[in-house]
């Protein structure tokens, strides 16, 4: 069957992007397009629920916003999940965010999902699923302790 992690992103404790992992493999990531009309500070929580069947360690995450590296901090690590957090400041009307465990260009073109989040109209859309099955949960009702961003 192959290895498959679970990968979710929680944005400001209000929006959850679920199942961003690939159908198979040790990679996870996505491309986000965020539209906003004024300055916004977004707190992103990345939740990885690893499949330990074939690995000893979880790959780290890399985040770029409009081609600038974003600092990502590992905040929790258990047998059941690994949590990273990052803060992104939106200054432009349109912000492109790349989140990945492996930066191979082919993964962004054909495998990682592409999601559009319009913060003005509150319309959130999956533009391309590619080799994953993502969905958007809004408003978020945290059902796991680590999903709450208090």
From Swiss-Prot:
Induction: Expressed in the early phase of the viral replicative cycle. Keywords: Early protein. Pfam families: Pox_C7_F8A. InterPro entries: Poxvirus_C7/F8A. One of its GO terms (biological process) is viral process. It comes from the Viruses. Belongs to the orthopoxvirus OPG027 family. Plays a role for multiplication of the virus in different cell types. This is Interferon antagonist OPG027. It comes from Monkeypox virus (strain Zaire-96-I-16) (MPX). The lineage of its organism: Viruses, Varidnaviria, Bamfordvirae, Nucleocytoviricota, Pokkesviricetes.
């Amino acid at each position: 069957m192959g290895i498959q992690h679970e990968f979710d992103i929680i944005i400001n404790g209000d929006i959850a992007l679920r199942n961003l992992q690939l159908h198979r493999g040790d990679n996870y990531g996505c491309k986000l397009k965020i539209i906003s009309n004024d300055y916004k500070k977004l707190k992103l929580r990345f939740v990885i629920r690893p499949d330990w069947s074939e690995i000893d360690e979880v790959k780290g995450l890399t985040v770029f916003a409009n081609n600038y590296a974003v600092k990502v901090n590992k905040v929790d690590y258990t047998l059941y999940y690994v949590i990273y957090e990052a803060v992104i400041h939106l200054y432009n009307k349109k912000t492109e965010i790349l989140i990945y465990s492996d930066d191979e260009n082919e993964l962004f073109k054909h495998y990682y999902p592409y999601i559009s989040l319009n913060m003005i109209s509150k319309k959130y859309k999956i533009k391309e699923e590619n080799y994953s099955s993502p969905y958007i949960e809004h408003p978020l009702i945290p059902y796991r302790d680590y999903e709450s961003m208090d």
